[in-house]
Curated annotation (Swiss-Prot):
InterPro entries: IsoCit/isopropylmalate_DH_CS (IPR019818), IsoPropMal-DH-like_dom (IPR024084), Isopropylmalate_DH (IPR004429). Binds 1 Mg(2+) or Mn(2+) ion per subunit. The gene is leuB. The keyword ATP-binding does not apply. This is 3-isopropylmalate dehydrogenase. Homodimer. Mg(2+) binds at D227, D251, D255. It comes from Buchnera aphidicola subsp. Uroleucon aeneum. It catalyses: (2R,3S)-3-isopropylmalate + NAD(+) = 4-methyl-2-oxopentanoate + CO2 + NADH.
Amino acid sequence: MTRKYRIAVLPGDGIGPEVMREAYKILNILKDDFSLPLEIKEFNIGGAAIDQEGVALPKKTLLGCENSDAILFGSVGGKKWDNLPINQRPERASLLPLRKHFNLFANLRPAQLYSELKNLSPLRSNIIKNGFNILCIRELTGGIYFGKPTGRLKKNNIEYAFDTEIYYNYEINRIAHLAFQLSQTRNYKVCSIDKSNVLNSSILWREIVKKVSKHYPDVHLSHLYIDNATMQIIKDPNQFDVLLCSNLFGDIISDECAMITGSIGMLPSASLNEKKFGLYEPAGGSAPDIEGKNIANPIAQILSLSMLVRYSMNLKKIADKIDQSVISVLKKGYRTADISNNNDYLKTNEMGDVIASALISGE
């Protein structure tokens, strides 16, 4: 009997359900036209779950995710729930617990400038003439966001605050191995970002990355300090392939990479654990300002599904076909509002339709 791939679908809030409907079109094609044995189950998450079940991450949802091979996530949050205590708000009470529960230590953020969308980038045309395709790999469960002690105190009428950057060798080791392995599916280049001229945690980071690199002699390793890296990305993004970053530095640099592509509505992301179980979601948020207007760009959600197929299902050729269907519609001039220079653009459902048609026809 053929093993089924079990996918937990969590549409969430804001534009999440709208763009997820378009991802469903691709999922149905994978089932019906590509004959993939998919078992798809949908669960509540975020504000929608608060409204219907009283909590942002219901036990039923968590159990459904545990019984799945991957999670396809929409978005959570919105003004409606901003009056709740911060730890009960959709973002804090659903997405973060999911990451922790499944030990999703690696965040993958591709930032690709498609040649058809060069006009959207804030960079000069001579800099981006060849486009760029960067994969930012961010360590997600360690570093200064989770280090102890942390706090805010007052002594002798002087107020002060402090945080602690801690990295254990195994945390750096596993994220480094993943970066080198993924670079071998791309252009065999890893640039590790640190601040080893100042920080002890970065000194350890660089030492371990160098040791790990010896297992991958075919991959070229370079190092940059975070301050120089932010400048180099603006100067020549095409020089980079895989960026390997700590939690804090990856948080900064992945958003910079996203910005220079011109539209966050195009960008997917993945968070993986050591078993390649993953949570896949658009890099943007719930965008409540455009909710219900049928103008959200579904491409990031569709490309998030492509990443799920690539990394959790290990079906590279099919993932490539999904990616190519997106490129095909962009080459034909189809645009959503966020990437259009005029009022001639497709609605959310229309963009989903043309991508689905391109996938079926193999364009």
